[in-house]
């Protein structure tokens, strides 16, 4: 059955518009530099690999916060400072340092131009489990809204965050196209909510056999923009 033209789009951010791990590594180094200067005992006790392990441990201890990376990070920092004998007053400044670096991203080569093309034709909701700041990154004007797992209280692939996107955009599930890189979080999550999906498969990966396939698949966001322009062209105005 042909995919009907969408009335709106929802778009994942991390690993869809930019690669996330270089960004996280950059932020981890910025945090460690801050701690080395302001809280050297914490920096010595928690080098980057150990701080990463601590964050995973904290996340495991607080499964009810699986949707909130910000609180997970702050709890990790508070634990590290307390354990090392430094003052927990530094938690917010340490987090702010990490977060500023987390928002210094490098777009995939095609992503920004493709986003501009899509935003010129459809209302778009950013739909993310992460905590990127679209204003800091400079792309907030391309989106109608940024819907986060933290704000909704549910993370992808759970249906409530997808339903929230539909409600916010004022469309039915069958009128939304969700776009993202993750087979489970984006594609299977959208399918469970009755929403069509486009898999952005930048690494030419094989589709997991145990998941429902995407409705569309492209190697880049530009590929999706090209397909939509061809499949659903703008009509020229009547003279």
Where are the predicted features?
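N-terminal helical cap/lid subdomain that shapes the substrate entry/recognition surface
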Residues: 2-109
